Amino acid sequence: MSRKIKLFPCLRVTLLLAAAFLLGRAAAQVTSSVAASHSGQIQSSAEGNWGLGFQEEGRPPVGNATSQELAQYDAFYLGDTDKKRIYLTFDAGYENGNTAPILDALKKHEAPAAFFVVGNFISENPDLIRRMEEEGHIVGNHTSTHPDMSRIATLEAFREELEGVEASYKEITGKEMTRFYRPPQGKYNVENLKMAKELGYHTFFWSLAYVDWYQDDQ
């Protein structure tokens, strides 16, 4: 919310450090953003939707903001590309019986993952949240109501979207939530990244997405 695990169509699995998948902006816009990256600032044309563009085979994808530009806001979409490592992440917006089998598969293969959960998922599935935490997975913040965060202009409103999930997680597990944040639908702007950093969050995008939100195409 599964990417490329066809059994699990309701959760988005994103693979960082994988081959590219085009999302959001057109390739021309991505190229323009990368060409302008010498300034070290995220270009205004990159704001709104997180987007990726293909390079040659075997090369990491190009985002509409570079790793260096994102890093100044504690934001990421790639890890160390010299290492053969992937990061499994799931955006969990609702539950239809697939999360437990995903956790079973991860446990079988001793594969840790990160689950970015929204408010209704965490409040309606406390047993799954506890299991994620107990089995060594990261539970990250995907906001309380899954809004277009790029339209949120104040720190107060931004904080409100994150604090509800934090509070639910602590109530369920007795622990503080890891401050990892994924913008719903990948919609963001530079001010959002600054707000997330001010609140102590790392923002995580993706380098490959399995398009499972089109359920009829699975």
Give residue spans per PLM region.
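N-terminal Sec-pathway targeting helices
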Residues: 2-16
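Sec-dependent signal peptide cleavage junction
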Residues: 24-38
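Helix-enriched interaction subdomains in cytosolic or periplasmic regions
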Residues: 38-59
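Active-site beta->alpha N-cap acidic-glycine motif
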Residues: 52-150, 164-170, 177-178
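Short, solvent-exposed loop/turn segments at secondary-structure boundaries
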Residues: 150-155, 215-217
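Soluble catalytic domains of enzymes that build or remodel membrane lipids, polysaccharides, and related
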Residues: 159-164, 173, 194-195
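Extended hydrophobic secondary-structure segments that form protein cores and membrane-embedded regions
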Residues: 180-183
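His/Asp/Glu-enriched short active-site or ligand-binding loop at hydrolase and phosphoryl-transfer sites
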Residues: 193-218
